[in-house]
Amino acid sequence: MVAKRIQKIREGVDPTKLYALTQAIGMVKERAIAKFDETIEVSMNLGVDPRHADQMVRGVVNLPNGTGRSVRVAVFARGAKADEAKAAGADIVGAEELVEIVQGGKIDFDRCIATPDMMPLVGRLGKVLGPRGMMPNPKVGTVTMDVKGAVEASKGGAVEFRVEKAGIVHAGIGKASFDAKALEENIRAFADAVIKAKPAGAKGNYVKRVAISSTMGPGVKIELASVTAPNA
């Protein structure tokens, strides 16, 4: 039964063909037939080797239509900044006591923000938060005094990205229930952010391949001209 379902959703998708973005979105949405609202993910193969510091690709993008998922945000802050975080809608706010909770292995959040003065404490959590991609970092706006703005961005559709060892960067950019236009706008916003994050050490073609897929569906390769600038 499962094999037949997999075969059915793969029908009509040629893994060797490149599709226009709008067509690819339609194909992915049609094949998102699971009993839950599948996440739509975009992946980009880049011409970089992240083992070299000058070829690291990292950044954050605010998707115009959000991600469709509820994001739990933790904020490490004291005093007025802690109050600001709570007022902005942060799910968990604390200082030393929150550090101890996380050190104990309880991570009940998806995104982590810290004020600069908290980083000596939060730095102790590198081994816990680092592997999960949650360590606050000023480069992606999660170490900041603008706590309100950071919390609202995280709740509203901010997506962090970081290239992996194989030169791939990927992210969930919406749900199958989104209309095609919303998904297209989110994909373009993500691709633009990745292109703008092109490192100085990147040589040759920067964007090599772009594909989208749903949680349970096949990947659909996209014509680069559909999503990237000519010089990408």
From Swiss-Prot:
Key words of the record: Repressor, Ribonucleoprotein, Ribosomal protein, RNA-binding, rRNA-binding, Translation regulation, tRNA-binding
An annotated Gene Ontology molecular function: structural constituent of ribosome
Cellular-component GO terms for this entry: cytosolic large ribosomal subunit
Any GO BP: translation
Domain of life: Bacteria
Oligomeric and partner information: Part of the 50S ribosomal subunit.
NCBIfam families (alphabetical): rplA_bact
Family, per entry: Belongs to the universal ribosomal protein uL1 family.
Chain's role: Binds directly to 23S rRNA. The L1 stalk is quite mobile in the ribosome, and is involved in E site tRNA release. Protein L1 is also a translational repressor protein, it controls the translation of the L11 operon by binding to its mRNA.
PANTHER family assigned: 54S RIBOSOMAL PROTEIN L1, MITOCHONDRIAL, LARGE RIBOSOMAL SUBUNIT PROTEIN UL1M
HAMAP family referenced in this protein's UniProt entry, alphabetically: Ribosomal_uL1_B
Official protein name in the record: Large ribosomal subunit protein uL1
Protein's organism: Rhizobium rhizogenes (strain K84 / ATCC BAA-868) (Agrobacterium radiobacter)
Gene that encodes the chain: rplA
